[in-house]
């Protein structure tokens, strides 16, 4: 605990540990680590929780409402009769943190930067798929369209056409009017524009510090680039109510932007600190050194948090998470000298890369996960059951799909069938990973290990906690054989779960090398159903996909606990919006 208190002092928020944080300061201790502060690159809750406070989009959520949007950097918009053009009228008098005025050119630059770079491990696909029709970066799409043996001339021609689509996707009608031109109608486009990737960046500031020039001249140099190496990774170019002071990789310090168009917020300083150990976070909460902390489960809330004085547990039966948690299987593990698959062979000391391509193994592991224990013991009955990777309250969810619960006899039956009996005969060794500090995922990993190893002494599972950034990196590199992970919605439409989890080009499915033409065909077709009278058909397709997923089992959905927020009891203005990465905007809170 001492090292964290010393860090608070070193960051200049106060000179010593006190009974309460200053009245104008908000201190939040989270379990995860920020990956990137670039709106195009950031694609995890810890990163987006910062981005959504230092940057802004054209519209934003109206506090705790998922269906009501309020004008932010735009004041109004219209949609063409054919649903292909969205025109926004921008707010005048908005200044970036640099002092530069915001105009249409900044909005255009920000969206086109998404379309130009399209990092493979980012959310840029959210916009590319509807504005240009492409869900991957230009070179990836060129190889997909032309094949690996395409000539340079063929690739250049494809890239020229791709650039023309980027140019046509966003246009400035005048200094304060911007239009987005869709490749095809999409009912979720407005919802997509609320995602942090659509945040408006100070184009002059960005270009001056070495980012993409905003022109055709250097766009090819930026295709698919990892933006963690660029200036905006650690520097702020936003309009938000807070501006970045410092990010050292583990701690974010921000301060109120006095030139904010919406008026300076009450809270003047913010510290978001990544603290892996839950016990350390809880002690900081108890002492008053933190205003909010991450707590992993309802079991901890009931056993420890509710015993603390001066602490408030915010919860409401109406709160429903916009997320899903599953155990992923990798159908073809990647990476040389991969430490998670042992020998790389089915010899008792490892697993082959395509180990989980056998449905019998996936079923066996599913029957080794004690979902009742997760729901009843870890969540103490505060949660929701999941039959598929879609929130139960969202359209297209099928509550009638069966749930595989703990059944070691069935697990043994499927283990004996796996790989023609060789798995049972030879045994295996693999490693399950989770992000360090996340006791829920640790519990899931330990359950699977204990139950699998109890079936056959030749079955061996190691468990390896990884730092959050390393965990994400390993998952994106497709090097993990099996791992538990959650997904929070980017935009409020069921497509944002169905496509990532079940489509071969989905941001999650491609990490596990899951490819099934029948899934792809249905999901692609569902995306063409954009008219109001077609929505019932679209949601029936999603239910069918859920039933197919039960049979194919690309992942194991498991219960998700009911949301709660833990703060000191003097924090006011707290609310829960499941579409925000950290539940509420900093500008809305204060202290009594």
Whereabouts are the PLM-identified features?
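Boundary at the C-terminal end of the N-terminal hydrophobic targeting segment
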Residues: 17-20
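Bacterial N-terminal signal peptides
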Residues: 8-15
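Extracytoplasmic/periplasmic ligand-capture domains
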Residues: 63, 91-121, 156, 181, ...
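N-terminal lobe/hinge region of extracytoplasmic solute-binding protein
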Residues: 29-81, 237-238
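Long beta-strand-rich cores associated with HINT superfamily self-processing modules
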Residues: 565-592
């Amino acid at each position: 605990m001492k090292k964290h208190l010393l860090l608070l002092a070193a960051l200049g928020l106060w000179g010593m540990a006190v009974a309460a944080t200053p009245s104008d300061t908000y201190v939040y201790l989270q379990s995860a680590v920020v990956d990137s502060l670039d709106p195009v690159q950031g694609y995890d809750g810890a990163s987006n929780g910062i981005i959504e406070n230092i940057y802004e989009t054209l519209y934003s959520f109206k506090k705790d409402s998922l269906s009501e949007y309020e004008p932010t950097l735009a004041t109004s918009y219209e949609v063409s009769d054919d649903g292909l053009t969205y025109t926004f009228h921008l707010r005048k008098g908005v200044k970036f943190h640099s002092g530069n005025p915001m105009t249409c050119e900044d909005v255009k630059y920000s969206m086109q930067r998404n379309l130009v770079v399209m990092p493979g491990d980012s959310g840029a696909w959210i916009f590319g798929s509807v504005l240009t029709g492409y869900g991957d970066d230009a070179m990836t799409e060129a190889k997909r369209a032309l094949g690996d043996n395409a000539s340079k001339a063929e690739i250049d021609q494809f890239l020229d056409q791709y650039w023309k689509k980027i140019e046509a996707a966003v246009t400035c009608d005048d200094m304060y009017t911007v239009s987005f031109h869709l490749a095809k109608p999409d009912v979720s486009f407005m919802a997509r524009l609320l995602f942090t990737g659509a945040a408006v960046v100070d184009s002059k500031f960005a270009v001056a510090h070495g980012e993409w020039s905003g022109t055709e001249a250097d766009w090819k140099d930026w295709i698919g680039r990892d933006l963690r190496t660029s200036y905006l990774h650690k520097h702020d170019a936003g309009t938000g109510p807070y501006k970045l002071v410092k990010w050292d990789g583990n701690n974010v310090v921000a301060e109120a932007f006095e030139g904010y168009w919406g008026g300076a917020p009450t809270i003047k300083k913010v510290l978001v600190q990544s603290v892996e150990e839950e016990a350390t976070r809880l002690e900081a909460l108890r002492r008053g050194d933190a205003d909010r902390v991450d707590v992993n489960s309802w079991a901890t809330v009931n056993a420890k948090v509710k015993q603390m004085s001066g602490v408030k547990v915010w919860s409401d039966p109406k709160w429903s998470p916009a997320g899903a948690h599953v155990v992923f299987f990798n159908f073809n593990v990647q990476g040389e000298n991969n430490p998670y698959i042992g020998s790389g062979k089915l010899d008792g000391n490892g697993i082959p890369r395509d180990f989980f391509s056998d449905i019998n193994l996936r079923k066996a592991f599913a029957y080794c996960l004690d979902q009742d224990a997760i729901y009843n013991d870890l969540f103490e009955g505060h949660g929701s059951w999941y039959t598929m990777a879609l929130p139960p309250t969202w359209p297209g969810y099928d509550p009638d799909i069966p749930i595989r619960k703990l059944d070691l006899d069935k697990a043994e039956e499927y283990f004996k069938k796996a790989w023609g009996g060789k798995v049972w005969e030879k045994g295996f060794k693999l490693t399950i990973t989770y992000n360090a500090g996340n006791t829920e995922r640790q519990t899931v990993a330990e359950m699977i290990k204990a139950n699998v190893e109890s079936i056959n002494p030749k079955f061996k599972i190691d468990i390896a906690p990884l730092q959050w950034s390393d965990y994400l990196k390993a998952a994106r590199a497709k090097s993990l054989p099996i791992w538990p992970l959650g997904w929070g919605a980017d935009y409020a439409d069921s497509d944002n779960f169905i496509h990532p989890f079940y489509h071969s080009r989905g941001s999650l499915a491609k990490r596990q090398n899951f490819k099934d033409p029948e899934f792809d065909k249905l999901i692609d077709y569902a995306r063409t159903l954009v008219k109001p009278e077609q929505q019932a058909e679209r949601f029936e397709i999603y239910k069918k996909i859920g039933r197919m997923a039960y049979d194919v089992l690309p992942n194991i959905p498991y219960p998700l606990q009911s949301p709660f927020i833990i703060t000191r009891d003097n924090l006011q203005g707290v609310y829960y919006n499941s579409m925000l990465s950290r539940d509420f905007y900093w500008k809305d809170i204060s202290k009594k």
